[in-house]
Regions:
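Conserved alpha-helix/loop element of class I SAM-dependent methyltransferases that forms part
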Residues: 1-10
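S-adenosyl-L-methionine
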Residues: 45-75
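Glycine-rich SAM-binding Motif I of class I
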Residues: 21-25
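C-terminal substrate-binding/active-site "lid" region of AdoMet-derived donor-dependent transferases
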Residues: 86-146
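Conserved SAM-binding motif I beta-strand of class I
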Residues: 34-39
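A short SAM/SAH-binding and catalytic strip from SAM-dependent methyltransferases
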Residues: 74-90
């Protein structure tokens, strides 16, 4: 996902629904960028914090228990999503506020009504299953209903 978003050291990555924190940890370790993980589940926040500490990336990664649907995304240059399609769609109003040029990437699920710039098929090394990674660039263009 991070490669598809073309993350660099200068990016600020926001992972919405960060789960165990693997994306923000990878962003910090592989690219040396600042990364923020957000989740509402206290158990997932603890897992993320443990993962950050275990990987010694506390100086680059921040984990917050916060509602992703009210989150200020103005500082993000990359937003990662691994959420159900209905949640991706619910995030559209927030994603429309991203600064121009910001990248959004989603694992497996697109956003109904918003055409991705590109879709990348990837095959998981662990099990050989193919997944899709979708990428959008802000400002996103929502299709008008006819």
């Amino acid at each position: 996902m991070l490669e598809v978003a073309k993350v660099t050291k200068n990016d600020i990555v926001y992972d919405l629904g960060c789960g165990d924190g693997r994306i923000v940890v990878t962003a910090a370790k592989k690219f040396g960028c600042k990364a923020y993980g957000f989740d509402v589940d206290p158990k997932r926040i603890k897992e993320s914090l443990d993962n950050v500490k275990k990987n010694r990336v506390e100086q680059l990664v921040t984990i917050k228990q916060q509602d992703i649907f009210t989150l200020d995304l103005s500082k993000a240059s990359v937003v990662t999503l691994y959420l159900l399609p209905s949640l991706n769609v619910k995030l559209i109003p927030q994603l429309k506020k991203l600064k121009p040029g910001s990248r959004i990437v989603s694992h497996d699920f697109d956003m109904a009504g918003v055409e991705p710039d590109e879709g990348f098929p990837i095959t998981m090394k662990s099990n050989g299953i193919e997944h899709m990674i979708y990428r959008w660039t802000a400002p996103i263009k929502v299709k008008k209903e006819e």
